[in-house]
Regions:
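Retroelement reverse transcriptase polymerase core
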Residues: 1-161
């Protein structure tokens, strides 16, 4: 496996800046809001003080890669949820879009259930998994919907979309 990774290393992104994203002419993600839903701003959460510098570093990496941008005003505001990886201790900054998710229509074609996929793979000698870390950053958000993805960061880091 290591040999394959080395041989095809140019096929993988090893940091955020190596992920240029798809062209807007090919695909853009839109966030329609169901009727009857009003914009919602979550109250800012507090975090352990030792996490704040690591959150700030991750936000700066996302800014440098142009995955996010500062936002001056947004009607929809969500909180970040910092998640520490058990094995590596690496911090992943997730966003709590629970209010926005309730307001958007459900997909007509939902993702398959993980257990079903694993059961269907039984009998094979090798099963591999890929971590799609930051994969959602590869599809641009339609400009008119970008502010709906706004999130607030603790410690006066700011508001981003």
């Amino acid at each position: 496996m290591i040999g394959l990774l080395k041989e095809y290393s140019d096929c993988f992104a090893w940091n955020y800046t190596e992920m240029p994203g798809l062209s807007r002419e090919i695909v853009e993600h839109r966030l329609p809001i169901k009727s009857g839903f009003r914009p919602f701003k979550q109250r800012a959460r507090t975090f352990r003080p030792d996490l704040l510098p690591r959150i700030k570093d991750e936000i700066h990496r996302l800014l440098e890669a142009d995955f996010i941008r500062p936002c001056r005003y947004a009607e929809w505001v969500s909180n970040i949820v910092p998640v520490e990886k058990k094995e590596s201790g690496k911090l992943r900054v997730c966003i709590d879009f629970c209010n926005l998710n309730r307001a958007t229509p459900k997909d007509e074609y939902p993702m398959p259930i993980a257990d079903t996929l694993i059961n269907n793979a039984s009998g094979n000698r090798i099963i591999s998994f890929l971590d799609g870390n930051a994969g959602y950053n590869q599809i641009f958000m339609a400009e008119e919907d970008a502010s709906k993805t706004a999130f607030i960061c603790p410690g006066f880091i700011g508001l981003f979309e």
